[in-house]
Amino acid sequence: MNDYQIMRLDAAPRVLFKFDGRILFSSDRFEMVHLSLDPGASMELHTQPFDVVFYLSEGSGILTIGLEELEIQSETSVMVQAGVTRAWKNNGKGMIKILVCKLKE
């Protein structure tokens, strides 16, 4: 077994969402998911039992955290603590791409 793992985005397993999500890495302690949301697409408000760091690599969108809506621009990261409600919405004209890092420990 190797001391490393390589995963190409186009070969990564899909997550079960209504938009394109790919699992780039997953372990008991950490998971990395790449999300792509088309213009107008949004995810439902939800919570997770672990901290999550989002990195918006392309586009801009609305990140709802609790009762607050934040306009997030590309090349920005946001950490949301475990148990806090969150959701993304693409309110722009182009696709947004988000790297989701789940800190499960």
Specify the residue positions occupied by each region the protein language model found.
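A short, N-terminal "cap"/entry segment at the start of jelly-roll beta-barrel domains
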Residues: 1-29, 33, 78
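Conserved short histidine dyad/triad with adjacent acidic residue
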Residues: 33-48, 82
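Short, surface-exposed secondary-structure edge patches
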Residues: 34, 44, 53, 68-70
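Short, conserved beta-strand element in jelly-roll/cupin
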Residues: 36-38, 48-63
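Structural motif
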Residues: 60-62, 69, 85, 95
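Ligand-binding loop in jelly-roll beta-barrel domains
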Residues: 82-105
